[in-house]
């Protein structure tokens, strides 16, 4: 049975965050706002890491889909958002399915359809190098499985990488006036919040790690 992709995404995040919050409450007998925010961010980042691995594996298909969107809809016009289309279980467990995230986002910033750009490389790097640390950090801040020193060192390294990479990406997006190709609503409603999350939450993670 095919459901809206958004249903799967919400269910995944609810299970991920719910498990961490319940574990923290059971272990420490307290709800903590910093833990909650970083639990939500860990869930988001782990999902995006998988999508970023799809960016690497299916870069050629992403380029072809992006060019198809431009030919059909015109430059800067978003196709139907994949989150609101139906998908089967077999599709959502396929890297190929999540590659459409990048062919869609390439309409706003063509960096993701070009393997020579900083945007492509920094996101692939995030996906390949931070998936396992994200999962380990999420578990470690919930259950006492790692020493505080190791958690702090890992958190500072991981979150600094995410923060710095996002700041440089957003700089090149603005400096190269990528926003000129998109309606202001798309820039303010998609690009700015998406990058803002990866600046604000890693900054909080660095503070918590210290």
Regions picked out by a protein language model, each given a short descriptive name:
Residues 1, 101-120, 179-192:
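Juxtamembrane membrane-interface segments at transmembrane-helix boundaries in membrane proteins
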Residues 1-12, 32-48, 119-126, 148-158, ...:
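Transmembrane alpha-helices of multi-pass eukaryotic membrane proteins
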Residues 11-18, 196-208:
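Hydrophobic cores of alpha-helical transmembrane segments in multi-pass inner/ER membrane proteins
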Residues 30-37, 57-106, 177-183:
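Interhelical loop segments of eukaryotic multi-pass membrane proteins
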Residues 126-138:
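Core segments of transmembrane alpha-helices
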Residues 137-151:
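Juxtamembrane helix-break-helix junctions at the cytosolic face
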């Amino acid at each position: 049975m095919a459901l809206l992709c958004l249903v799967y995404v919400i269910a995944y995040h609810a299970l991920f965050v719910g498990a961490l919050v319940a574990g923290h409450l059971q272990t420490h007998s307290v709800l903590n706002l910093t833990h909650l925010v970083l639990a939500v961010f860990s869930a988001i980042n782990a999902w995006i890491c998988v999508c970023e691995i799809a960016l690497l594996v299916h870069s050629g298909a992403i380029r072809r889909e992006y060019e198809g969107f431009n030919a059909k809809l015109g430059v800067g016009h978003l196709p139907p958002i994949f989150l609101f289309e139906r998908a089967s279980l077999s599709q959502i467990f396929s890297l190929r399915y999540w590659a459409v995230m990048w062919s869609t986002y390439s309409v706003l910033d063509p960096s993701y359809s070009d393997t020579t750009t900083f945007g492509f490389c920094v996101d692939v790097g995030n996906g390949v190098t931070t998936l396992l640390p994200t999962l380990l950090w999420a578990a470690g801040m919930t259950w006492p499985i790692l020493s505080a020193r190791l958690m702090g060192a890992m958190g500072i390294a991981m979150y600094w990488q995410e923060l710095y990479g996002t700041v440089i990406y957003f700089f090149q997006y603005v400096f190269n006036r990528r926003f000129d190709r998109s309606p202001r609503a798309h820039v303010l409603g998609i690009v700015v919040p998406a990058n803002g999350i990866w600046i604000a939450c890693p900054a909080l993670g660095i503070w918590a790690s210290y």
